[in-house]
């Protein structure tokens, strides 16, 4: 599906979807607990991949309104073929969990996931006793077979998902573990994992980049209410800043690193108010200026920041974002190509971009390149002109109903 977004003012209230990061982890923790309910999860293509994987390892799942009821497994003894579609989080965490099973499994995904390397995670799990067969750097498909045992292990973590995988798996492994993490990116996503583990009664002690994980623990999640997603909220905040006024509800504090979007927008001169007690964020049209942004912990915000940078006066430099080159696509190159298509000057760097903004109108054709965050972000620039986004259906990966939400705020959206 292609989408055209046309110039117009937006105004109104909206509630962003539930957090994708929290939903993944809550589903997995629930599937490892005797009896748990996950309330108000995000149901999207990626989280459905996790839900299906939870069922494949033996969890029973029942939907009841906006609650998902789980009867979980006592230990992982799964085998067979696992297709995780486009979900990197599902792939990485379940690679760790399947390392607990004495039986052989094959993990796979779609064309995009088959390009995402897992070498550092495979190396760490292999040192703990897992066996893998595949081609380095272990892009899917590859096979995994346990059983890992606790021990001392270290990992270079270009993806925080590798660390999350080890934290889940080692808490169930026989024997205590010490995990040393080097060159970590996106620490807040690890904090989200620790938050869910803590709610599940799983103990992890952290000291700097060292984690001590007692072995043979039991998951005891009872109920988890999934908070709103700040990554998804970032697009609506950006819409308010460039084209009117948006009030977002249900935006309470959490461990999500992407809550930093509020501070970044303010640094750019944006009028953004956040009432944390009421969980309300208000964003109004503002004159924006370029800034420098360290994206090491906020990779999913970079497309949003790039769109705001295109509007802002002056230059914006985004750095420490080299991990964007191994996301669903090479996001640095994808952002550069879409900015170029809209007449915005940008320079891709090894670890980010420099964007020269200040345009008041945007007309042209952009492409999602199969990446949901590209479609979510770049379609917004149509509010200041007319932008056609190719392959926009991928928004369903993290924000189903996105264009309906824009329409409810007054945007003109044409589906082709």
Swiss-Prot record:
Enzyme Commission number, as recorded: 2.5.1.19
Gene Ontology annotations of biological process type: amino acid biosynthetic process; aromatic amino acid family biosynthetic process; chorismate biosynthetic process
Active site, per annotation: 300 (proton acceptor)
Entry's family note: Belongs to the EPSP synthase family.
A cellular-component GO term for this protein: cytoplasm
Keyword vocabulary terms for this entry: Amino-acid biosynthesis, Aromatic amino acid biosynthesis, Cytoplasm, Transferase
Compartment(s) where it occurs, according to its Swiss-Prot or TrEMBL record: Cytoplasm
EC supergroup of this enzyme: transferase
Residues the record lists as binding 3-phosphoshikimate: 20-21, 25, 159-161, 186, 300, 327
Subunit record text: Monomer.
Pfam families xrefs: EPSP_synthase (PF00275)
Gene3D superfamilies with a match to the protein in the record: Enolpyruvate transferase domain (3.65.10.10)
InterPro entries, sorted: Enolpyruvate_Tfrase_dom, Enolpyruvate_Tfrase_sf, EPSP_synthase, EPSP_synthase_CS, RNA3'P_cycl/enolpyr_Trfase_a/b
Protein name: 3-phosphoshikimate 1-carboxyvinyltransferase
Molecular function GO labels: 3-phosphoshikimate 1-carboxyvinyltransferase activity
Residues annotated to bind phosphoenolpyruvate: 20, 88, 116, 161, 331, 373
Pathway: Metabolic intermediate biosynthesis; chorismate biosynthesis
Taxonomic lineage: Archaea, Methanobacteriati, Methanobacteriota, Archaeoglobi, Archaeoglobales
Catalytic activity: 3-phosphoshikimate + phosphoenolpyruvate = 5-O-(1-carboxyvinyl)-3-phosphoshikimate + phosphate
């Amino acid at each position: 599906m292609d989408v055209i977004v046309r110039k117009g003012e937006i105004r109104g209230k909206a509630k962003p979807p539930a957090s994708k990061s929290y939903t993944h982890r809550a589903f997995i923790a629930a599937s490892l607990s005797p009896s748990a309910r996950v309330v108000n999860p995000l149901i999207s293509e990626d989280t459905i991949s996790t839900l299906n994987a939870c069922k494949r390892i033996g969890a029973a799942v029942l939907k009841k309104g906006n609650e998902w009821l789980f009867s979980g497994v006592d230990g992982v003894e799964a085998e067979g073929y696992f297709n995780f579609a486009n979900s990197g989080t599902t792939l990485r965490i379940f690679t760790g969990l399947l390392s607990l099973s004495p039986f052989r499994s094959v993990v796979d995904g779609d064309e995009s996931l088959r390009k995402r390397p897992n070498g550092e995670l495979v190396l760490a799990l292999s040192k703990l006793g897992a066996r893998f067969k595949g081609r380095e750097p272990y892009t899917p498909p590859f096979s995994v077979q346990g059983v890992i045992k606790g021990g001392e292990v270290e990992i270079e973590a270009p993806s925080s998902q590798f660390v999350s995988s080890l934290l889940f798996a080692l808490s169930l492994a026989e024997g205590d573990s010490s995990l040393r993490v080097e060159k970590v990116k996106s620490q807040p996503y690890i904090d989200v994992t620790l938050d869910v583990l803590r709610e599940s009664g799983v103990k992890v002690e952290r000291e700097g980049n060292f984690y001590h994980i007692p072995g043979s623990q039991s998951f005891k999640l009872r109920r988890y209410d999934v908070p709103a997603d700040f990554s998804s909220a970032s697009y609506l905040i950006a819409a308010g800043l460039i084209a009117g006024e948006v009030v977002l509800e249900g935006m309470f504090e959490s461990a999500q690193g992407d809550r930093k979007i509020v501070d970044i927008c303010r640094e750019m001169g944006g009028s953004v108010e956040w009432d944390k007690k009421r969980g309300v964020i208000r964003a109004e049209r503002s004159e924006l200026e370029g800034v420098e942004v360290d994206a090491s912990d906020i990779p999913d915000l970079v497309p949003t920041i790039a769109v705001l940078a295109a509007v802002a006066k002056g230059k914006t430099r985004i750095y420490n974002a080299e991990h964007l080159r191994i996301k669903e696509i090479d996001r640095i190159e994808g952002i550069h190509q879409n900015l170029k298509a809209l007449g915005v000057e940008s320079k891709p760097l090894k670890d980010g971009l420099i964007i020269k903004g200040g345009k008041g109108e945007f007309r042209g054709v952009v492409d999602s390149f199969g990446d949901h965050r590209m479609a979510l972000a770049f379609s917004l620039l149509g509010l200041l002109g007319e932008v056609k986004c190719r392959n926009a259906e991928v928004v369903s990966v993290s924000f189903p109903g996105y264009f309906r939400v824009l329409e409810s705020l007054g945007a003109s959206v044409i589906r082709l």
